Swiss-Prot record:
Signal peptide: none annotated. Pfam families: Aldolase_II (PF00596). Binds 1 zinc ion per subunit. Catalyzes the dehydration of methylthioribulose-1-phosphate (MTRu-1-P) into 2,3-diketo-5-methylthiopentyl-1-phosphate (DK-MTP-1-P). The keyword ATP-binding does not apply. This is Methylthioribulose-1-phosphate dehydratase. InterPro entries: Aldolase_II/adducin_N, Aldolase_II/adducin_N_sf, MethylthioRu-1-P_deHdtase_MtnB. Keywords: Amino-acid biosynthesis, Lyase, Metal-binding, Methionine biosynthesis, Zinc. Its EC number is 4.2.1.109. GO terms for biological process: L-methionine salvage from methylthioadenosine; monosaccharide metabolic process. The gene is mtnB. It catalyses: 5-(methylsulfanyl)-D-ribulose 1-phosphate = 5-methylsulfanyl-2,3-dioxopentyl phosphate + H2O.
Length: 204
């Protein structure tokens, strides 16, 4: 897929995710694999519901901008580490929904476990509700290289992992194509909302 086509996919993803309330204001960042050595990412500080062709830039896999005058998101390394370690990944989405943020703060453990939900089958490789979807939660850290170093061992040990939360911050998920990553965002958001409602009903 060409740069122009990937840019359109990123722009359309931003409009969709902003419209759902999952990427408010200038939060969040999105990317697509441009080649084996380059990624296309949203420029830092841009409103995700109002992205245009100039609001994306190419970076190398170390997170360095390849376009003078354009600054990548501070969290670029969390995108490129997925492209580097998982050749099948073609798109990465990071969102800041209310449900993801609140649930990550309410959960004292370092992970969430979802089971017996039919919608688990929306995740790549899951074929039955009689399974577990484990979502790790990493503490937020302004030092992105240090945060990436904490995430990588989990990714290496859990090839089935479909996404993770950063506490008080948001969700990262990915897919072979942008449509796959968007599908998983929707599935995660459904599960997060169910979990919060279950906790409210059970008063825990």
């Amino acid at each position: 897929m060409s740069r122009e086509q990937l840019s359109v996919e990123i722009i359309e993803a931003g409009r969709f995710l902003y419209g759902r309330g999952w990427s408010p204001a200038t939060s969040s960042n999105y990317s697509a694999r441009l080649s084996a050595t380059e990624a296309l990412l949203t420029v830092s500080g841009k409103h995700k519901g109002q992205l245009g062709p100039d609001d994306v830039l190419a970076t190398d896999m170390a997170g360095n901008s390849l376009e003078p005058g354009k600054k990548p998101s501070a969290e670029t390394l969390l995108h490129t580490q997925l492209y580097s370690s998982r050749p099948q990944v073609g798109a990465v989405l990071h969102t800041h929904s209310v449900n993801a943020t609140v649930l990550s703060r309410l959960t004292a453990a370092d992970h969430l476990v979802f089971e017996d939900y039919e919608l688990q089958k929306a995740f790549h490789g899951v074929v039955t509700h009689q399974s577990q979807v484990v979502v790790p939660i990493f503490d937020n850290d302004q030092d992105i290289a240090r945060l990436a170093a904490k995430v990588q061992p989990w990714l290496d040990a859990h090839p089935e992992c479909a996404g993770y939360l950063i506490r008080g911050h948001g969700l990262y998920t990915w897919g072979a194509k942008m449509s796959d990553a968007l599908r998983q965002i929707e599935a995660f958001e459904f599960l997060f909302e169910c979990e919060l409602k279950m906790r409210a009903v059970l008063n825990r």
